[in-house]
Amino acid sequence: MSDGKKTKTTVDIYGQHFTIVGEESRAHMRYVAGIVDDKMREINEKNPYLDINKLAVLTAVNVVHDYVKLQEKCEKLERQLKEKD
């Protein structure tokens, strides 16, 4: 979507309802929320003693870690492509 038009949708993350607004499609926002929900549940299985705030922060740290690793991999591939030219 990303045409500047705002889309509003309600999602469920870890048993809580959130209304989110973005420029992406509702399907995309639900997909992203589903990933967050899955990650929170995955971390909770390994750390059931965490309160919701610590679980949310640990989830954010894990997701950003994954993002940084993918970003580094992308940059490495871009460098390799430039070296071939």
Curated annotation (Swiss-Prot):
InterPro entries: Bac_CellDiv_Activator, Cell_div_ZapA-like, Cell_div_ZapA-like_sf, Cell_div_ZapA_firmicutes. The keyword Cell division applies. Pfam families: ZapA. Its main location: cytoplasm. Residues 58-85 form a coiled coil. It comes from the Bacteria. Keywords: Cell cycle, Cell division, Coiled coil, Cytoplasm, Septation. Homodimer. Interacts with FtsZ. This is Cell division protein ZapA. The lineage of its organism: Bacteria, Bacillati, Bacillota, Bacilli, Bacillales.
